UniProtKB/Swiss-Prot annotation:
InterPro entries in the cross-refs: aa-tRNA-synt_IIb, aa-tRNA-synth_II, aa-tRNA-synth_II/BPL/LPL, Ser-tRNA-ligase_type_1, Ser-tRNA-synth_1_N, SerRS_1_N_sf, SerRS_core, tRNA-bd_arm
Protein name, UniProt field: Serine--tRNA ligase
Similarity field: Belongs to the class-II aminoacyl-tRNA synthetase family. Type-1 seryl-tRNA synthetase subfamily.
One Pfam family recorded for the sequence: tRNA-synt_2b
EC number of this enzyme: 6.1.1.11
Residues that coordinate or bind L-serine: 236-238, 290, 389
Binding residues annotated for ATP, in chain numbering: 267-269, 354-357
Coiled-coil residue windows: none
Chain's gene name: serS
Quaternary structure, from the entry: Homodimer. The tRNA molecule binds across the dimer.
Enzyme class name: ligase
Domain of life of the native organism: Bacteria
Chief location bin: cytoplasm
Substrates-to-products reaction catalysed: tRNA(Ser) + L-serine + ATP = L-seryl-tRNA(Ser) + AMP + diphosphate + H(+); tRNA(Sec) + L-serine + ATP = L-seryl-tRNA(Sec) + AMP + diphosphate + H(+)
């Protein structure tokens, strides 16, 4: 969450910056909560001072052998008032915390102001889309003859799932292995294996809760009627990776922390009804290789550009045309201060589609998680956190199928993946 001191010092400026994100800050509610908090805290201090004064009087009266009952009765009454004030203050603090958790991150000054994706700014294009001398097919038609099956998945589970068999399943696995190897061997990340089920504290730490619970899949021990705390399937490995440093104080020389993980991701896709209903572009379950960095605050924007380059390197090695865009204020994710999207060329759609999103969250997540490091003065200071897809495996598979398709229905496997394919250099349609 953002620093509450910013609201206390200049709430109107904060409200104006958030308006660029299409978020209306309820200034009146915050001011009312703060006014009552100050009033109670001031009253509490007065009561405590009065109690201290009376306690001294009791001592003096006892020393003189005089009656202390009236003064002691007043002290007892003050104790009751203090308990009531403390209880009300706890309620207020909870309301203020709830208020703060609902506020998105402040956009960095370099982020273009805009309403939606139409106002995003293209930074660069890399690679030239291939010219085909035959009718281009989409990944659904190509994949149907290669072992990609949505009907069986619908029978097993429902819509927005897929089954892969044979060579295409191996290609999917090869992509994930290639991404992990590149990030660990070339980019300096530590590979991690993390839980695919997390608790509410973890999701609150990275910003999915409480605001976006409808986007999640909830699970319980013992089935739907089971007992115990609410647990959730991860929407991205960003959640468990980033929460590794929750409630930790790192040594300054331990920064940056670079972590990567391959995991399935589970999303309800609330609000996306009717969008991308065909194929693998938008599914309830998909694989992704995630990158996370925990860095010194002064180096987070350097790290953002670095991470964008790491994601780009995967696309370059695969020979896939892509572009990089800077998201405008109105199109950024809840926790991001600045985001670059990488979009890969999909011939069948004749357009670029998102395949990676790389974001600097500054101290937004760290403040929620209390992820800190010891600064040069030895004092705990909030880290900055960054995350990015490196890449979405399913969408990368889609891009490979469409960009490397052949007229006979086969798909040439990018050379960089050959070591992972057991000698296969081309996927052939199954009889």
């Amino acid at each position: 969450m953002i620093d509450i001191q910013l609201l206390r010092k200049d709430i109107e400026t904060v409200a104006a910056r958030l308006a660029g994100r299409k978020f209306q800050l309820d200034v009146n509610t915050f001011n009312a909560l703060e006014a009552e908090r100050k009033q109670i805290q001031s009253g509490t201090e007065e009561l405590q001072n009065r109690r201290n004064t009376l306690s001294k009087q009791i001592g003096a009266l006892k020393g003189k052998g005089e009656d202390t009952s009236a003064v002691m009765a007043e002290v007892a009454g003050i104790g009751d008032e203090l308990k009531a004030s403390a209880a009300r203050l706890d309620v207020l603090q909870a309301e203020i915390s709830k208020f703060m958790l609902a506020i998105p991150n402040l956009p960095h000054e370099s982020v273009p102001v805009g309403k939606d994706e139409e106002d995003n700014v293209e930074l660069r294009k890399v690679g030239t889309p291939r010219a085909f001398d035959f009718e281009v097919r989409d990944h659904v038609d190509i994949g149907a003859a290669l072992g990609l099956d949505f009907d069986v998945a619908a029978k097993i589970t429902g819509s927005r799932f897929s089954v892969m068999k044979g060579g295409i399943a191996r290609l999917h696995r090869a992509l994930a292995q290639f991404m992990l190897d590149t990030h660990t061997e070339e980019h300096g990340y530590t590979e991690c294996y993390t839980p695919y089920i997390v608790n509410a504290d973890s999701l609150q730490g990275t910003g999915q809760l409480p605001k976006f619970e409808a986007d999640l899949f909830a699970v319980k021990k013992g089935g739907q009627e089971g007992e115990g705390e609410a647990l959730y399937l991860i929407p991205t490995a960003e959640v468990p990776l980033t929460n590794i440093v929750r409630d930790e104080i790192l040594a300054a020389d331990a920064l940056p922390v670079r972590m990567t993980a391959h995991s399935p991701c589970f999303r309800s896709e609330a609000g996306s009804y009717g969008r991308d209903t065909r194929g693998m572009i938008r599914q309830h379950q998909f694989d992704k290789v995630e990158m996370v960095q925990v860095v010194h605050p002064e180096k987070s924007y350097e790290a953002l550009d670095e991470m964008c380059g790491h994601a780009e390197n995967i696309l370059k090695k695969l020979g896939l045309p892509y572009r990089v865009i800077t998201l405008c204020t109105g199109d950024m994710g809840f926790g991001a201060s600045k985001t670059y999207d990488l979009e890969v060329w999909l011939p069948a759609q004749n357009t670029y589609r998102e395949i990676s999103s790389v974001s600097n969250c500054e101290a937004f997540q760290a403040r929620r998680m209390q992820a800190r490091f010891r600064n040069a003065q030895g004092k705990p200071e909030l880290t900055h956190t960054l995350n990015g897809s490196g890449l979405a495996v399913g969408r990368t598979l889609v891009a490979v199928l469409e960009n490397y398709q052949q007229a006979d229905g086969s798909v040439i496997i990018p050379e960089v993946l050959h070591p992972y394919m057991g000698g296969l250099t081309r996927l052939l349609p199954q009889a």
